[in-house]
A protein has these predicted regions:
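Outer-envelope beta-barrel architecture signal
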Residues: 164-168, 180, 191-195, 227-231, ...
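Hydrophobic, lipid-facing positions within transmembrane beta-strands of outer-membrane proteins
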Residues: 100-102, 152, 166-170, 180-184, ...
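Residue-level signature of outer-membrane beta-barrel architecture
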Residues: 188, 222-226, 292, 353-356, ...
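Cleavable N-terminal targeting peptides that direct proteins into the secretory/outer-membrane pathway or into
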Residues: 1-27
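Acidic/polar loop-and-plug regions of large Gram-negative outer-membrane beta-barrel proteins
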Residues: 202-206, 219-223, 230-293, 308-342, ...
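Outer-membrane beta-barrel translocator/receptor signature
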Residues: 129-132, 143-220, 226-230
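Acidic, small-polar-rich N-terminal luminal/periplasmic segments of exported/outer-membrane proteins
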Residues: 13-15, 29-165
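Transmembrane beta-barrel strands of outer-membrane/channel proteins
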Residues: 170-174, 197-203, 233-239, 302-308, ...
Length: 432
């Protein structure tokens, strides 16, 4: 009986499907409907950094990754480390807990950073509160960006004042570690002029008990249009003060639960001196840019930057891997202070000339840049002996405890301090 019911069901099913097959065959003469489309997502079409002219990315002979303002907002990008997480061929380094450090196609750098196409080579942690988009150029490009750029450059494009729009935007966030962040972006249209103010404050805390700090910045910008000329003037103040935490060192094979890699079980151990490890940065930056339409085919653009930077970095750090025995592990530590004072002057001018020869259109670029930089950098080494200033006394092997017990440290500045660095440099560069 069961066999009969199953067979009947199959027959009914086949019978029911017969007309459908016939209908499908009858519909073969119906007009075809084709739907096409694409999702832009974060796609951008043109770049200005690669050639200093608005050029389609497909026409730029270099690999370029563009992070748009929408992507920065959606992914809450607040640091270079956040940024490069989504960019192939680029990775972030630790930066000794006091600066941005990236590897671009195998080339490690702390200096190949630019703002609006102007060099930004001071060592600090960059924020993105006033950044409209970021263009990452991979591969050597000294012809466009000048010195450096062996593996590529990271160029941040700042937000400009908008003459025909009022904008009010604020962001607030906090996390379970106790850190919090707030930013504001206000643009006020004033006829043919505009005022834009960006600012942020961030209280720094994370899973490491010894780490804390704060950073904040403000960037007012005013723009005005006078006939065929647009001018923009901006000032930025940046302050960053934090504990210099260089993380967890590695351990030799056969020690600390047998890793030949990062030591295990020291998630909260601070491998430094809590009342000494500190990074403090302050910057005053003045920017000016203009664009003049001289004729239908000629456009003249200028940019200028003045920056005054002051940074101090003090740290005790793990100079060796963890050694000793499982019962009595040890680690070698060293210390130094690294103050830097720098003043930077940059002036840049470009003339764009559009011409035609027959059916071909050309865009010619004539430009030049003048750079001046006065810098004073010193490395003051720490010694674990008040009388014998030798390389042997620059390192001390201590027991691995939590907290780490650091012996008294003596800092000596000048030629008597073995292996110290005291560099004063003045750079004047003209390129065209």
């Amino acid at each position: 009986m069961k066999l009969y019911q199953i067979s009947a069901a199959l027959v009914i099913s086949l019978a029911a499907s017969g007309p459908a097959l016939a209908d499908d065959a009858a519909d073969t003469d119906a007009p075809a409907i084709i739907v096409t489309g694409h999702m832009d997502g974060y796609r951008t079409v043109e770049t200005n950094s690669g050639t200093k002219t608005n050029t389609p990315i497909l026409d730029v002979p270099q690999s370029i990754s563009v992070v748009t303002s929408q992507q920065i907002a959606d992914q809450q990008v607040r640091s270079v480390a956040d940024l490069v997480r989504y960019i192939p061929g680029v990775s972030a380094g630790q930066g000794e807990g006091n600066r941005d450090q990236v590897t671009l196609r195998g080339n490690n750098t702390t200096a190949d950073f630019f703002v609006d196409g102007l060099r930004d080579d001071v060592q600090y942690f960059r924020s993105f509160y006033n950044i409209d988009r970021v263009e990452v150029h991979k591969g050597a490009n000294a012809m466009v960006f000048g010195r450096g750029g062996g593996g590529g450059v990271i160029n941040r494009i700042t937000k400009g004042a908008i003459a025909d729009q009022n904008l009010y935007e604020a962001t607030v966030s906090l996390d379970t570690f106790g850190s919090y962040y707030g930013s504001a972006d206000v643009n006020i249209a004033l006829g043919s002029a505009a005022l834009r103010v960006n600012g942020f404050y961030e209280d720094l805390n994370n899973h490491r008990d010894a780490f804390s700090g704060e950073r904040y910045a403000v960037n007012p910008t005013v723009a005005a249009e006078l006939g065929n000329t647009r001018m923009e003037l901006g000032y930025e103040y940046v302050r960053d003060s934090r504990v210099a935490d260089r993380g967890i060192p590695s351990a030799f094979a056969g020690t600390i639960a047998d890793p030949a890699g990062p030591a295990r079980g020291f998630r909260d151990t601070f491998f430094g001196k809590r009342d000494f490890n500190d990074s403090d940065f302050e910057a005053h930056v003045l920017r000016f840019r203009s664009e003049s339409r001289l004729s239908e085919n000629l456009t003249f653009k200028t940019q200028a930057l003045y920056g005054d930077y002051d940074k101090s970095y003090s740290n005790v750090f793990a100079a060796t891997a963890i050694g000793g025995t499982a019962a009595a592990p040890t680690i070698g530590i060293e210390a130094y202070i690294d103050p830097t004072k720098r003043q930077t002057y940059i002036g840049q001018a470009n003339l764009e000339w559009r011409i035609s020869t027959g059916s071909f259109e050309h865009l010619l670029l004539f430009g030049g840049e003048i750079t001046g930089q006065n810098s004073r950098n010193e490395r003051i080494n720490g010694f674990f002996s008040p009388t014998v200033l030798s390389s042997a006394n620059r390192r001390s092997t201590v027991a691995l405890t939590d907290p780490l017990i650091v012996p008294p440290i003596f800092f000596v500045s000048g030629p008597t301090g073995n292996s110290n660095r005291n560099v004063r440099s003045n750079l004047d560069q003209v390129s065209a």
